[in-house]
């Protein structure tokens, strides 16, 4: 597979998000239900605070404790329904788009075959078609709408807390930005290389295992099972080390997220108490601002958790885009000649897989209506020569003729 220069995350997002356009109404519905659901979850705690204020005889927006608990019950029921609807909408979009991407990938493979499937990276292709495309589900189901939901919820909760006093609102906004923007960006930058290495290690392991299965007969015949087993173990250990580092990064991100949330809540509480002591904020304001900080980080935490996950998404998307943009080894000829078979000839043909030369200065004539046997040791290039006759690849040197016509000027359909 052609190696890209590693597209920037913005370039990858631009390519992936274009596919969402036909599903825009469903995406908007998911965003609306997500925002409503998170506000319901947040105000369950806040209305509990309103109930406590009323029970203590302090100023409260609710008239009775019973009203507060009735609102809590309604919010709890709505939260469940809205959460289910949001997730159903997001995954509907994701699975529809993954099916579309798979269709594009198989279309690219049809365009690149047969040379692509005759290469030595079939395990890499299997990894791309399965694991890499499946990884894009994180982007479509857990990235686009959560980012929109978090932005709306941050604005809404900052405004709500700001209605009591601007200082706790600014402290809370700073906490939102640290958890939802600074932390995931830092995590993604630190884990970008590791994610790419993990995806490549997974593809290499798949290729090695598939190669081992395909050559099982030869492995048994030449009693090479111990070496193959050691190779599989080595690939597995390498993959495990890559995954271990990613899990460490993920755990560190979660720990930092929880720490920042706790510090933000304490900062909001401290700011509110300071305002209370100076008479600029009532006791009810201290309670509501603190409860708002405690209960409103849900949408922002979803963004913080994306940091490590998105690095793998971008690594997988980069590999998928590499395949979609890859050019065929030999382009189909449609403006050549439809030459009937009148014998074939190879003249000083050379060919190499990457840097490994298989054929060197081979000349051979295949007469019309004759049977020609090609013999040689295993790996000497017999099958390769037959595929060159079918123009899976172009020769590195020399030429192949059908009759008097160079094979590169014969229409592909006629071959």
What role is predicted for each listed range?
Residues 1-41, 61-67, 86, 90, ...:
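Membrane-integrated ABC transporters
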Residues 22, 26-39, 142-197, 270-281:
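Transmembrane helices of ABC transporter permease
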Residues 27-82, 162-167, 283:
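Transmembrane helix-loop-helix hairpins at lipid-water interfaces of multipass membrane proteins
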Residues 88-107, 148-149, 172-217, 224, ...:
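Cytoplasmic coupling helices
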Residues 293-355, 394-396, 401, 410:
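ABC transporter TMD-NBD coupling linker
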Residues 339-415:
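ABC-type nucleotide-binding domain
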């Amino acid at each position: 597979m052609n190696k890209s220069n590693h597209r920037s995350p913005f370039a990858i997002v631009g390519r992936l998000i274009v596919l969402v356009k036909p599903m825009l109404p469903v995406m908007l519905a998911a965003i609306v239900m997500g925002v409503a659901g998170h506000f319901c979850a947040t105000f369950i705690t806040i209305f509990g605070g309103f109930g406590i204020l009323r029970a203590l005889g302090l100023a409260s927006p609710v008239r009775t404790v019973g009203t507060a608990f009735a609102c809590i019950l309604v919010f709890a029921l709505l939260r469940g329904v809205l959460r289910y609807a949001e997730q159903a909408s997001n995954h509907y979009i994701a699975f529809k788009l993954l099916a579309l991407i798979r269709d594009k990938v198989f279309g690219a493979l049809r365009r690149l075959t047969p040379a692509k499937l005759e290469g030595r990276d079939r395990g890499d292709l299997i990894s791309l078609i399965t694991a890499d495309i499946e990884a894009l589900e994180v982007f479509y189901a857990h990235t686009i709408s959560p980012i929109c939901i978090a932005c709306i919820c941050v604005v809404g909760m900052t405004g709500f807390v700001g209605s009591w006093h601007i200082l706790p609102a600014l402290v809370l906004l700073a906490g939102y930005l640290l958890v939802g923007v600074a932390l995931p960006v830092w995590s993604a930058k630190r884990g970008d290389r590791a994610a790419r290495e993990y995806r490549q290690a997974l593809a290499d392991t798949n290729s090695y295992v598939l190669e081992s299965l395909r050559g099982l007969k030869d492995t048994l015949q030449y009693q090479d099972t111990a070496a193959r087993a050691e190779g599989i173990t080595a690939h597995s250990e390498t993959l495990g080390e890559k995954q271990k580092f990613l899990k460490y990064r993920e755990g560190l991100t979660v720990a930092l997220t929880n720490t920042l949330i706790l510090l933000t809540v304490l900062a909001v509480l401290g700011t509110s108490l300071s305002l209370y002591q100076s008479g600029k904020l009532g006791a009810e304001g201290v309670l509501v601002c603190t409860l708002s900080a405690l209960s409103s980080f849900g949408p922002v935490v979803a963004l913080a958790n994306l940091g490590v996950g998105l690095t793998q998404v971008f690594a997988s998307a980069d590999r998928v885009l590499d395949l979609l943009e890859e050019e065929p080894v030999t382009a189909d000829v449609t403006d050549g000649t439809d030459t009937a078979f009148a014998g074939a000839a190879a003249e000083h043909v050379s060919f190499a897989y990457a840097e490994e030369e298989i054929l060197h200065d081979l000349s051979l004539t295949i007469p019309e209506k004759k049977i020609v046997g090609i013999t040689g040791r295993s790996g000497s290039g017999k099958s390769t020569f037959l595929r060159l006759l079918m123009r899976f690849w172009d020769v590195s040197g020399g030429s192949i003729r059908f009759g008097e016509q160079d094979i590169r000027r014969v229409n592909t359909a006629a071959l």
